[in-house]
Amino acid sequence: LFSFKELNEQFKRKIKVVLPVDLVLIIAASFACYCTNMENTYGLEVVGHIPRGIPPPRAPPMNILSAVITEAFGVALVGYAASLALAQGSAKKFKYSVDDNQEFLAHGLSNVISSFLFCIPSAAAMGR
């Protein structure tokens, strides 16, 4: 992976389209697994059939709530704090105001609604 990324950097001027190396490696590894029957030969676990489309919305399983409540609270708190810090930083840089309550409501609703589609929690990401 590293050597391919270095090659992309060297040939960036000559080739206008950057090769998506990560995607190429995933496809090559999947093809190699399929062709060499690595599931049976080496005991590797293969995902199998992946259904198409978006799964229908359904309620998250409430029977595991007691097991994950503390971790979920921590993820929610850190995600909200990071998102709010970045929003306030952008507001200061571009001279606009941020309402903490509106951010809290938007962040909470987006994560609650996305839980019915079994999405991962959303939060802002701090760049370099």
Swiss-Prot record:
Topology in the lipid bilayer: Multi-pass membrane protein
Predominant place of localization: membrane
Residue stretches spanning the membrane: 15-35, 67-87, 104-124
Membrane side Cytoplasmic: residue ranges: 36-66, 125-128
Tissue specificity comment: Expressed in gastric epithelium, predominantly in the gastric parietal cells but also at lower levels in mucosal cells.
Cystine pairings recorded for this chain: none
Entry similarity comment: Belongs to the SLC26A/SulP transporter (TC 2.A.53) family.
Function description: Acts as an anion channel mediating the transport of chloride, bromide, iodide, nitrate, sulfate, gluconate, thiocyanate, oxalate and bicarbonate ions. Its permeability towards bicarbonate is weak and increases when pH is above 7. Mediates thiocyanate transport in retinal pigment epithelium cells. Mediates iodide transport in the thyroid gland, playing an important role in the synthesis of thyroid hormones and the maintenance of thyroid function.
Protein name as annotated: Anion exchange transporter
Organism in which the protein naturally occurs: Oryctolagus cuniculus
